[in-house]
UniProtKB/Swiss-Prot annotation:
One of its GO terms (biological process) is photosynthesis. Residues 59-69 have a biased composition (Low complexity). Residues 55-82 are annotated as: Disordered. GO terms for molecular function: bacteriochlorophyll binding; metal ion binding. A bacteriochlorophyll c binds at H26. Belongs to the BChl C/E-binding protein family. It is found in: Chlorosome, Chlorosome envelope. Keywords: Bacteriochlorophyll, Chlorophyll, Chlorosome, Chromophore, Electron transport, Magnesium, Metal-binding, Photosynthesis, Transport. Component of the photosynthetic apparatus. The light harvesting B740 complex binds bacteriochlorophyll c. This is Chlorosome protein E. One of its GO terms (cellular component) is chlorosome envelope. InterPro entries: Bchl_c-bd (IPR001470), Bchl_C-bd_sf (IPR038387).
Length: 82
């Protein structure tokens, strides 16, 4: 008999190894999910409220020179004016 330990001890060790892997795996998955949720929330917030995140425009790569409101290039006439 090479291993004098009983079945209960071996079962407890096996269960402990299983539980360790199970809990470690779940922490990994939950941690990744929370990280991705945080990044997505930040990105959506920056797109919706660019002034809160230090940007002047909601579109990435937009030039400060051309951002802002559009200006008409010709005279604007009302459709219902007589």
């Amino acid at each position: 008999m090479n291993n004098p330990r009983g079945a209960f001890v071996q079962g407890a060790e096996a269960y402990g190894r299983f539980l360790e892997v199970f809990i470690d795996g779940h922490w990994w998955v939950v941690g990744d999910a929370l990280e991705n949720i945080g990044k997505t929330t930040k990105r959506l917030g920056a797109n919706a409220y660019p002034h809160l995140y230090g940007g002047s425009s909601g579109l990435k790569g937009s030039s400060p020179k051309y951002s802002g409101y559009a200006t008409p290039s010709k005279e604007v006439k009302s459709r219902f004016e007589k």
